Design a protein with these regions (language model features):
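Active-site neighborhood for divalent-cation/phosphate handling
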Residues: 65, 69-170
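Gly/Thr-rich phosphate-binding beta-strand-loop-beta motif of the actin/hexokinase/Hsp70
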Residues: 1-33, 64-69, 168-181
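Short, glycine- and charge-enriched coil/turn segments that flank and shape catalytic ligand pockets
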Residues: 21-22, 38-47, 117-125, 169-176
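Cytosolic/nucleoplasmic/matrix-facing N-terminal domains/tails
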Residues: 3, 48-58, 74-75, 131
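N-terminal phosphate-binding loop and adjacent alpha-helix
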Residues: 28-58
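Switch/connector loops and helix/strand junctions flanking conserved nucleotide-binding motifs
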Residues: 24, 40-42, 75-79
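Amphipathic alpha-helical transducer elements in NTP-driven molecular machines
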Residues: 10, 46-53, 91, 138
Length: 181
């Protein structure tokens, strides 16, 4: 089993999904207030956040692996089109495009990308989703996770996690337009 963990500005939330008869099922969850531990840009009390996380975990589960959620407002993301002929140099091209597209020095960022298959209308290019986060925002969350004796196996944007969950739990509606609030 793996835990999904969201460290927000006012709440700490986690869920655990595990294999069910046919699909993954919700096995456990917790929501805990973290008042005055974090505001929009500043961490106020990491040790208190770790204590809250450990307390909720020990009460309900022994799961150690987690997928860490990061809010979209802390991430700069951009869709880019890249010619198929550039595939062999993709890492270099992504670094150049990140430098041009993101208003922070690359040394201050963690960034990653995901390649998507070409759109039907343009088979010569493929789409790439580039995502970058300032190290300070992710490092503080990773510090909390490590101090709580959890192992982060992935970091995912909030919006991408919601879309992925929708596709998993409602595959028959995959091509319908949806709005998530």
């Amino acid at each position: 089993d793996t835990m999904g963990l969201d460290i927000g500005s006012a709440m700490l939330k986690w869920v655990i999904f595990g294999p069910g008869d046919v699909y993954y099922e919700l096995k456990n969850y917790a929501i805990a207030a973290i008042p005055q531990c974090l505001d929009y840009k500043q961490v106020k009390d990491v040790s208190r956040m770790v204590a809250i996380l450990k307390r909720t975990l020990l009460e309900k589960t022994r799961v150690k692996n987690c997928v860490l959620n990061i809010p979209d407002h802390l991430v700069c993301s951009k869709w880019i089109q890249i010619d198929h002929s550039a595939y062999e140099n993709l890492d270099e091209i992504i670094a150049i495009l990140a430098e041009q597209s993101i208003p922070y020095p690359l040394k201050d960022l963690y960034f990653d990308y995901q390649r998507f298959y070409p759109a039907q209308q343009n088979q010569d290019n493929f789409k790439v989703l580039l995502a970058a986060c300032r190290k300070e925002h992710l490092d503080f969350r990773l510090d909390i996770v490590h101090q709580a004796n959890l192992t982060p196996i992935a970091v995912e944007l909030s919006s991408q996690a919601i879309v992925r969950a929708n596709y998993y739990f409602y595959p028959e509606n995959r091509y319908e337009n949806r709005m998530f609030l």
